[in-house]
């Protein structure tokens, strides 16, 4: 069976930690492909100011262009209305029903995962992979959450310690506003694109 993963996010901007997560997932789960999906209008970020979707899409495209096992989809940014994870996963599952799908998201989502729209259906469509930003440690509350999800949905949450650098898109945007160096946080072409388009000033 073919294994593929979806890695969603606002990618505002995309940075090296995103790339590291994708590479780690490729090896860990024997994936044929990781599909990067820039978020359209996620319900939990409605009020947050975001860089226009076509610009975020272009940055992701530049960041992954040399890796044949990475691809990008504009499904969410072209879809009308709110960008629900269920709708995205359903779309890809219907396109490739025989593929074994993984959905990769951050550890911070674990606390409100059970409140996601159509979470039952999401667990039926894919394997849920949680990655840690600072080196994964199974704290007591995380262990309880895992057990709760296993009992309720009969699905095991997979965890991935990707040895991720301490990088976030918010940190990058703030450093740019402050006139600080950020080139080492992202692929060179993304950095040049940000400079050329005077982003995050």
UniProtKB/Swiss-Prot annotation:
UniProt KW Secreted keyword: no
EC number: 2.7.7.18
NAD listed as a keyword: yes
Catalyzed reaction equations: nicotinate beta-D-ribonucleotide + ATP + H(+) = deamido-NAD(+) + diphosphate
Pathway note: Cofactor biosynthesis; NAD(+) biosynthesis; deamido-NAD(+) from nicotinate D-ribonucleotide: step 1/1
Transmembrane segments: none
Keywords per UniProt: ATP-binding, NAD, Nucleotide-binding, Nucleotidyltransferase, Pyridine nucleotide biosynthesis, Transferase
Protein family according to the UniProt entry: Belongs to the NadD family.
Function: Catalyzes the reversible adenylation of nicotinate mononucleotide (NaMN) to nicotinic acid adenine dinucleotide (NaAD).
Protein name as catalogued: Probable nicotinate-nucleotide adenylyltransferase
Gene: nadD
